[in-house]
Amino acid sequence: MASEGVLLGMGNPLLDISCVVDDAFLEKYGLTLNNAILAEDKHLPMYKELAANPDVEYIAGGATQNTIRIAQWMLGESNATSYFGCVGKDEYGDRMFKLASEGGVNIRYDVDEDLPTGTCGVLVVKGERSLVANLSAANKYKIDHLKKPENWAFVEKAKYIYSAGFFLTVSPESMMTVAKHAAETGKYYMINLAAPFICQFFKDPLMELFPYVDFIFGNESEARAFAQVQGWETEDTKVIAVKLAALPKAGGTHKRVAVITQGTDPTIVAEDGKVTEFPVTPIPKEKLVDTNAAGDSFVGGFLSQLVLGKDIAQCVRAGNYAASVIIQRSGCTFPSKPSFESQ
């Protein structure tokens, strides 16, 4: 059984505005598939255009929130997980609180009085996705919220703490605070590379945090972007995974494990200079709905078993199961109960 509040996530809560579009729509806004970016002024009219589409869907999103919701769903025990992030004082914020709390996650939103709740345009073309995040209120998360005694109590309770790298654009100070707390108390601190732009443009805060990172997650394009920025001169994901795991560690932390997903290609896990590959069972093309939140779901499934003390093979199996469920549905939505059997 998972103890109450064992897993804490901190990130950018965004309401996903999801729509199937065509290639011309991507071209119009200068977007590419399988990428995630922050919205610029030129992208802002896009949100109105999506909202006007009769088939638009609104889904609770944001990478870390997706991961925590999936972990909670897999664990099935109310309040096993908690989540911090900032929303606006509006209907979108209320809607997302309801959606995210339904599965039993203990949601602790900071509420910004001035800005609307953040949104993410999810553009789906033939099952592949392009993400454009307008952080808005999510960008206003303050360390003061984290340090309030009633919120810090959730940090104290957690044994595993996770953030997607996207949170580095908002509150690296909050990430560093909980990372140091984890090192001092023997807990696990875990992050996701999240997107190539995090590796490229937020290198300094990322590398400052890295000595405290016990588990690093990412997909092949993020891993290669990281390697390029580090000057490693390799595109071999196995080599990159070993190097990621071997980067210097702070005292009091655990040995780092690097986990790289590669779509339908094997998942790579590196630890102590050794690489293990775990095959992925591909989903038939006709069953693929969209890949939005596939990576987040993998991590959610993985963490659901990690917090139960299961071995890495079981964690990867659970991650692959969760991702396979999510890509057969629209956005980060899931059936009422998982059919995964813990071994």
From Swiss-Prot:
PROSITE patterns the record matches: PFKB_KINASES_2
One GO biological process term: AMP salvage
Top-rank EC class of the record's enzyme: transferase
Active site residues of this protein: D296
One GO CC annotation: nucleus
Signal sequence segment: none
Sorted UniProt keywords: ATP-binding, Kinase, Magnesium, Nucleotide-binding, Purine salvage, Transferase
Required cofactor names: Mg(2+)
Reactions the enzyme catalyzes: adenosine + ATP = AMP + ADP + H(+)
Molecular functions (GO terms): adenosine kinase activity; ATP binding
SUPFAM superfamilies linked: Ribokinase-like (SSF53613)
EC number from the UniProt entry: 2.7.1.20
The keyword Translocase is annotated on this UniProt entry: no
Pathway(s) this gene product operates in, as recorded in its UniProt entry: Purine metabolism; AMP biosynthesis via salvage pathway; AMP from adenosine: step 1/1
Cysteine disulfide partners in this protein: none
Magnesium recorded as keyword: yes
PANTHER family (UniProt xref): ADENOSINE KINASE (PTHR45769:SF3)
The family this protein is said to belong to: Belongs to the carbohydrate kinase PfkB family.
Task performed by this protein: ATP dependent phosphorylation of adenosine and other related nucleoside analogs to monophosphate derivatives. Can also act on the cytokinin isopentenyladenosine to produce isopentenyladenosine monophosphate.
Protein name, entry field: Adenosine kinase
Organism: Physcomitrium patens (Spreading-leaved earth moss)
Taxonomic lineage: Eukaryota, Viridiplantae, Streptophyta, Embryophyta, Bryophyta
